[in-house]
Regions:
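Basic, polyanion-binding surface patches
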Residues: 1-196
Length: 196
């Protein structure tokens, strides 16, 4: 499997645009892999390191794995995520189903972290957690708490619920494009081709 290394900051605009539409956060623990759709996150520099910050609610299955492994991958589509993948990974729990199998995703061994890359979402950021912080709802404006953390919605509900997020600051230890997927795709798209 050919992986073309990229400078993540050269692709920041494309990564953040994809994030707003939904990308995958993938974790692996005890031989179980789970992916979830995320649309909240940050890409930048902190502690003189490239960092991706992701947010995971307290009751999510992904959080239980992430707290043990302390690494993750961010998997980004070249265009938009397949609707089946988006539906399965965005509305189902890995406690109940094998989302990788249900969404027909192909896992690729990562270069450094234990969590795998996903062939069908070929832009990959491998991240090691350097810091994590649980959000304090009392410190947020009331309108945000009401909209994003409705206290009358159980923490097991998909979407907005009463559980706060934990912010995970992941040092990006590897970043690349899985090229085999691009070559086999019916629609050859290279993001930021001039930066090769």
């Amino acid at each position: 499997m050919t992986k073309r290394k990229i400078n993540v900051l050269d692709y920041s605009s494309e990564i953040l645009k994809a994030l707003s539409k939904g990308i995958l956060l993938t974790v692996k623990g005890d031989e179980k892999v789970n992916s979830m759709v995320i649309s909240w996150g940050h890409l930048g520099m902190e502690w003189n390191k490239p960092i991706f910050i992701t947010y995971v609610r307290e009751n999510r299955y992904t959080k239980a794995i992430l707290d043990k492994t302390l690494d993750f991958t961010i998997n980004i589509p070249l265009d938009k995520m397949d609707t089946k993948t988006f539906s399965i990974c965005g509305t189902k729990s890995g406690r109940d189903i094998d989302k990788i199998k249900e969404a027909n995703l192909t896992l690729i061994d990562s270069e450094i972290v234990s969590s795998p890359a996903v062939k069908e979402l070929p832009i990959t950021l491998e991240c090691k957690v350097l810091y994590k912080q649980k959000q304090v709802l009392d410190n947020l404006p009331d309108d945000i708490v009401k909209r994003d953390y409705p206290q009358d919605v159980d923490g097991t509900a998909v979407g907005s619920n009463r559980d706060p997020h934990t912010a995970y600051y992941g040092e990006i230890v590897a970043a690349y494009i899985i090229e085999e997927w691009i070559k086999g795709c019916c629609k050859l798209i290279y993001w930021n081709e001039s930066k090769k």
